[in-house]
Design a protein with these regions (language model features):
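Basic, flexible Lys/Arg- and Gly-enriched helix-loop patches that mediate nucleic-acid binding at interfaces
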Residues: 1-242
């Protein structure tokens, strides 16, 4: 059965569906020696190339969806390549699978990061329309009043549009530094930090502790990873109608 080429590429673990669509628009994908166009369909037996390199659309066709959780350490980058030679999260993943990262964390943020071999699942989980909770533990320097909490939950206009926390709860701490637990439903760059900074607060630590119903295991050490249980994977698939 034929399917849209971007879906086949995502299912084969080469990248998300959106990533494949960008390559199609750039003329970098061919099907049976013909330049692919958006909307083109293919089957896994077709000869498909990316930048002239033949890819295997069927390599994961019979493989079950896997999801991996990594406890990212601050200072580790979410990229495969780095001119400065810094450590990458991909150095800590099992090498037997083509992993697609679900969103990313900035350099100084630690905590829960998901990877999957199902590009379609990754794309759905990242898309803003899915409105999936992302919970963070954040240590804030400064005296936070109730009026600040109201502004953060009502919403603030940032340089890239309106943003807000869907929930803010006090997490403890003494003196000038206090911990809070906050929830956002988008994956915008540095969104949590920028919301606090908009009210002149400084974020001294930021840890992602939850994505959807998946929580960061307490015993999972920095830069260690573990597979989600099949029941958890099925719940993730169901949450985005896959």
């Amino acid at each position: 059965m034929s399917e849209r080429i971007q879906k086949l590429i995502a299912n084969a673990g080469y990248g998300s569906r959106r990533w494949a669509e960008r390559l199609i628009e750039q003329g970098r994908i061919s099907i049976n020696n013909q330049e692919a166009k958006l909307g083109d369909k293919a089957i896994i037996q077709d000869k498909v190339t990316i930048d002239g390199r033949l890819i295997d659309l069927g390599r994961y066709s019979e493989e079950e969806t896997k999801v991996l959780i990594l406890n990212k350490q601050a200072g580790v980058i979410c990229s495969n390549k780095d001119e400065e030679g810094r450590q990458s999260v991909f150095e800590y993943l099992p090498e037997n699978t083509r992993w697609v990262m679900v969103g990313r964390l900035d350099l100084n943020t630690s905590g829960l990061l998901l990877f999957t071999n199902n590009g379609d699942l990754a794309n759905k989980l990242m898309h803003p329309s899915s409105e999936i909770d992302r919970e963070y533990a954040v240590r804030v320097l400064g005296k936070v009043e109730e009026e600040h909490i109201k502004k953060l939950t009502n919403g603030i206009e940032l340089e890239d549009g309106f943003a807000k926390f869907h929930r803010v709860t006090l997490g403890g701490g003494e003196g000038a530094n206090r911990w809070y637990h906050v929830v956002v439903r988008e994956g915008r760059k540095r969104e949590v930090r920028r919301l606090w900074e908009a009210l002149d607060f400084k974020v001294s630590r930021l840890i992602r502790t939850r994505f959807s119903d998946i929580r960061l295991p307490e015993k999972l050490r920095s830069n260690q990873s573990e597979y989600l249980k099949p029941k958890q994977v099925q719940a993730l698939l169901k949450s985005v109608n896959l």
